[in-house]
Regions:
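Short, small/acidic-rich helices and loops at N termini and domain boundaries
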Residues: 1-94
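Glycine-biased, small-residue-rich flexible motifs in mid-sequence functional cores and linkers
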Residues: 1-22, 44, 85, 92-256
Length: 256
């Protein structure tokens, strides 16, 4: 892992400490914008407080960012724990990071994804499926059909591992011999490794479920698919509605 990858992890991962005040997506976006134009040699060394001040940050913010970057022992310990649980980081500057996320989400792409499973699946063409947890019978059949058809056409299925539409489509795809990328909103480390299934989570591998994590991962589900199928959604509220409306607003991928 090179210095830039370590830097992304130190700035964006809680490293097992829920009280660690990491950079938000907006703060990471601002830092990336301010870092543009810096020489490669500057990007490969550890940032100092003066570097952050020269980028336009006040002294308090510069001290906070430097404190995050100094947690190297905690990072090494966290990486070691992750390896034992078969969880590995893919930062926005890593070779394995999906280019389609950089292309579609640009500065809003996650600083780090944690992965469990076959990373080569990340480079395969995919479609996505989202939908409600409580499904009507006809919509459950639709979700299963999307999963089956993805496998039949050699496309990876991207979904969110929630009960209902997500798992229905995922299981149909796997049963048909297809590949699945499942972006979870709970503890990645507790997911059982399965053939043709790659689990991903944002920021860390041991974070508990939260509504914020569930909503945040929706942009990745929508952006990874060349098309997104919506099995069912409540009108005006809920995660499926929120993610789909944002996709339509920002044009990450076509919605069907």
């Amino acid at each position: 892992m090179n210095p830039r990858e370590r830097g992304f992890l130190l700035l964006t991962s809680r490293l097992g400490n829920p009280d660690r005040q990491v950079l938000s997506t907006a703060q990471l976006r601002m830092l990336a914008l301010r870092m543009r134009g810096r020489e490669c040699a500057q990007l490969e060394r550890e940032m100092t407080q003066q570097d952050f001040i020269e980028l336009g940050y006040d002294r308090e913010t510069a001290e906070r960012y430097c404190a995050l970057l100094s947690d190297t022992e905690q990072l090494d310990y966290y990486l070691s724990r992750g390896r034992k649980m078969d969880c590995n980081p893919v930062t926005r500057v890593s070779e394995d990071y999906p280019g389609i996320l950089r292309q579609r989400l640009v500065m809003d792409a996650p600083g780090c994804l944690w992965a469990k499973g076959d990373l080569s699946i990340l480079s395969t063409p995919a479609v996505a499926l989202v939908g409600s947890r409580e499904l009507r019978a006809e919509n459950r059949e639709f979700a299963a059909a999307v999963g089956y058809r993805a496998a039949e056409e050699g496309l990876t299925l991207v979904s969110g591992n929630a009960r209902g539409a997500d798992r229905t489509a995922q299981e149909a795809c796997l049963a048909a011999g297809g590949r699945v990328i499942s972006i979870v909103a709970d503890e990645l480390s507790k997911q059982a490794r399965r053939r043709n299934l790659l689990y991903l989570s944002e920021d860390d591998f041991d974070g508990a479920f939260s509504t914020q994590r569930a909503l945040s991962r929706n942009r990745c589900i929508h952006a990874l698919g060349r098309m997104v199928f919506v099995a069912q959604s409540d009108f005006g509220h809920g995660g499926t509605w929120d993610g789909t409306v944002k996709n339509l607003r920002f044009g990450w991928s076509p919605v069907a």
